[in-house]
UniProtKB/Swiss-Prot annotation:
Induction: By genotoxic stress and by DNA damage. ATP binds at G130, V131, P132, G133, I134, G135, K136, T137. This is DNA repair protein RAD51 homolog 3. PANTHER family: DNA REPAIR PROTEIN RAD51 HOMOLOG 3 (PTHR46239:SF1), DNA REPAIR PROTEIN RAD51 HOMOLOG 3 RAD51C (PTHR46239). Homodimer. Interacts with XRCC3. One of its GO terms (biological process) is DNA repair. Detected in various tissues. More expressed in reproductive tissues than in vegetative tissues, with the highest level in young flower buds. One of its GO terms (molecular function) is DNA binding. InterPro entries: DNA_recomb/repair_Rad51_C, DNA_recomb/repair_RecA-like, DNA_repair_Rad51/TF_NusA_a-hlx, HR_Repair_Mediator, P-loop_NTPase, RecA_ATP-bd. It is found in: Nucleus. GO terms for cellular component: nucleus. Belongs to the RecA family. RAD51 subfamily. It comes from Arabidopsis thaliana.
Length: 363
């Protein structure tokens, strides 16, 4: 007699499916061990639980004792976590509604906001890269100011963290943009609420500067240490709604010789930023530099850190010159179509480009 065996019930199949996609980063491991697992390709609990401790130790470059403890934790999580995963599932309609209702930070350039779906979205990591002088730091300062626009004026009423690795942050420039932002808010309030006095906007430029937490980072070790400290800092300052790193690549291009280790460290850093974005519902903006890349027989400009880093961010925006005008191009996004928009940098900050805008050597 031929035995076909019992077919698994739908509930068992659903449990197996849920278990297989449980992320490895949920395991209670040290950041270095977690980074080694993910770098070795062990991103799901099912992939960890299916290998021996010796294979895991070899692939992830860890000791066999560490591999054994990881396997034990993975098996426990598979058994205990599958039911909670199923109970916590979302349907696609709820996910779409959540995506559309995400708070966004305006760039003060409506054309740029339009291609971004309303602005820089919270709960995402957005990379913005381009050549020197294109306005990356200007965008970073603009976002650190605009995140503070009160909710009554359509903003988030939050605070900003600005991590400066290059020394390019200019407090005088931040004050200029803050003064323009306050003037715009007063005009908006006077227009939308004519029965109120326009001076009811209580925020002053000095208040905006006080709400920008500035960190100067002078080495990659300081950068790693600061990123590790961010979760605690934001927990104590829950109004923070944007984290800007200007730039993410500077110290890793200058001082890091071990490319494999650099990739692992940056991947671990990207995971931490993603976790912060989701946990605190804030926007993470990573400014990036460009480098030359040999492709199809010629050297071409490309964002630094290569293709592997490009998968570490939710959205990628590339800034470039077209004649005398600055343009932003959506190069990668799971929810936004590829599109480009022009913008200009004025004394008041980012604005829509006009026919008279020319390339100004102000940065």
């Amino acid at each position: 007699m031929i035995s076909f065996g019992r077919r698994k019930s739908p509930a068992i199949e659903e449990t197996s499916l849920a278990t297989s996609v449980m992320e490895a980063w949920r395991l209670p491991l040290s950041p270095s061990i977690r980074g080694k697992l993910i770098s070795a390709g062990y991103t799901c609990l099912s992939s960890i639980a299916s290998v021996s401790s010796s294979d895991l130790a070899r692939d992830a470059n860890i000791t066999e004792e560490e591999a054994f403890e990881i396997l034990k934790l993975a098996n426990q999580s598979c058994c205990n976590g599958s039911r909670s995963l199923i109970n916590g599932a979302k349907n696609a309609w709820d996910m779409l509604h959540e995506e559309e209702s995400l708070p966004r930070i305006t760039t003060s350039c409506s054309d740029l906001d339009n291609i971004l779906g309303g602005g820089i979205s919270c709960r995402d990591v957005t990379e913005i890269g381009g050549v020197p002088g294109i306005g990356k730091t200007q965008i970073g300062i603009q976002l650190s100011v605009n995140v503070q626009i009160p909710r009554e004026c359509g903003g988030l009423g939050g605070k900003a963290i600005y991590i400066d690795t290059e020394g390019s942050f200019m407090v005088e420039r931040a004050l200029q943009i803050a003064e323009a932002c306050v003037e715009d808010m007063e005009e908006y309030t006077g227009y939308m609420h004519k029965h109120f006095q326009a001076n009811q906007v209580q925020m002053k430029p000095e208040d905006i500067l006080e709400n920008i937490f500035y960190f100067r980072v002078c080495s990659y070790t300081e950068q790693i240490a600061l990123v590790n400290h961010l979760e605690k800092f934001i927990s104590e300052n829950k109004d923070v709604k944007v984290v800007i790193v200007d730039s993410i690549t500077f110290h890793f291009r200058q001082d890091y010789d071990d490319l494999a280790q650099r990739t692992r460290v940056l991947s671990e850093m990207a995971l931490k930023f993603m976790k912060l974005a989701k946990k605190f519902s804030l926007a993470v903006v990573l400014l990036n530099q460009v480098t030359t890349k040999f492709s199809e027989g010629s050297f071409q400009l490309a964002l630094a850190l290569g293709d592997s880093w490009s998968h570490s961010c939710t959205n990628r925006v590339i800034l470039y010159w077209n004649g005398d005008e600055r343009y932003a191009y959506i190069d990668k996004s799971p929810s936004l179509p590829s599109a480009s928009a022009s913008y200009t940098v004025t004394s008041r900050g980012l604005r829509n480009s006009s026919s008279s805008s020319k390339r100004v050597k102000m940065m």
